[in-house]
Amino acid sequence: MSIKTSNTEFKTRIRQQIEDPIMRKAVANAQQRIGANRQKMVDELGHWEEWRDRASQIRDHVLSNLDAYLYQLSEKVTQNGGHVYFAKTKEDATRYILQVAQSKNARKVVKSKSMVTEEIGVNHVLQDAGIQVIETDLGEYILQLDQDPPSHVVVPAIHKDRHQIRRVLHERLGYDGPETPEAMTLFIRQKIREDFLSAEIGITGCNFAVAETGSVCLVTNEGNARMCTTLPKTHIAVMGMERIAPTFAEVDVLITMLARSAVGARLTGYNTWLTGPREAGHVDGPEEFHLVIVDNGRSDVLASEFRDVLRCIRCGACMNTCPAYRHIGGHGYGSIYPGPIGAVISPLLGGYKDFKDLPYACSLCTACDSVCPVRIPLSKLILRHRRVMAEKGVTTKAEQRAIKMFAYANSHPGLWKVGMMAGAHAASWFINGGKTPIRIGAIGDWMEARDLPEADGESFRSWFKKHQAQEKKNG
């Protein structure tokens, strides 16, 4: 299992998504609603740019001292009675998790929403071993029933409306209740509660780990992560190795930014802090705690010119403002990481072979840059991907030939002049009344909505010479 969610060719995926009116309406409504709520919370907090500066500084500091903080975190978790496993690859991570599950003779695992567990494909590994995995986040639960991948890092089922959700519940679970969010949520809640009470293991992600205390922070709106960590006897937390904060003081800043940027709230409904397994005399918490720290290519990213992307706190704000995401949704990207952040991180974790198109699924409007709470220069990193791909020859043969032809013409002035004159004459033949009969792919659609300037068959160079001579003549 990789971060790739579709084997369909990129252009075909895009066409399918654009032609899906339900998805486009659902995503547009969500973007508008979350964006408006976010702006209210930003205005209420005040000094937002200073908050962004501070959050960015915290993340940069952690990345610059990551080895030290990882060591400190590991020591503290161990002192607290937990187990720590450093996984170099996704295979290492899933192998360890499976070993823990098998050592407990686990038949059922409950799981809260986690992008890193999606990234390493833990569900598939456990299911292949005969262990039932139940997603307990409301959106993820619906997607699991429908065998549909998530399309947003915070709101995984953003692409579905309530009619589709009711259909899924009816077909998979026999739901015959009303088509209201409240009724469907209550139905799912009753189903999941049975799983919470019977699962041997709970698996969660980790929004932030606190190096100073060895604590794990879980941020949710439904409280399901808290159930995953208190009812099962064993809790396994999985984190990307960069998701560390030095102390609770830094976490305070990051959570402030996360809640406002992700869903437009002061705080999410539940902020859970876990520091090791259940202590003697306590009634809540797991008997055993495991922290799996995943590299899976992050060390290479940290050492590269793309290291700024590791600041990401998975808030999804870039998706909530991106015009490309609005039209093609998360599934158009073919990765568990969609949107602008996905256009940067997917090629880094999954390679250019599968994700070479994503850096071009961007208009470079820089809207994502302006909302990122940790100031990741996403548009610059997307451009950087394009440069790297050109240097490595990853681009299409047609593009490579076009660039070579342009470079050759541009380095031969005589040929360039002839080409400009020929182009000027050709433009006058093919443009009439602002329109042209030429229709080539997306250019045809672009020209349908725009009028081209009229061409008189004269190149700028000849026009300039003529006017320069006229000015000299007039003295």
Give the role of each language-model region:
Residues 1-306:
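The feature marks the mature, well-folded catalytic cores of soluble enzymes
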Residues 6-34, 44, 407-475:
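Intrinsic disorder at enzyme termini
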Residues 72, 76, 80, 96-100, ...:
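Generic, well-ordered alpha-helical scaffold segments in large soluble proteins
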Residues 139, 182, 267-270, 397-401, ...:
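Short coil/turn segments at secondary-structure boundaries
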Residues 215, 249, 275-279, 338, ...:
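Short capping/connector residues at structural and topological boundaries
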Residues 281-309, 320, 324-433, 437-439:
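Ferredoxin-type iron-sulfur electron-transfer modules in oxidoreductases and energy-metabolism complexes
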Residues 312:
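Phosphate-binding glycine-rich loops and their immediate beta-loop-alpha structural context
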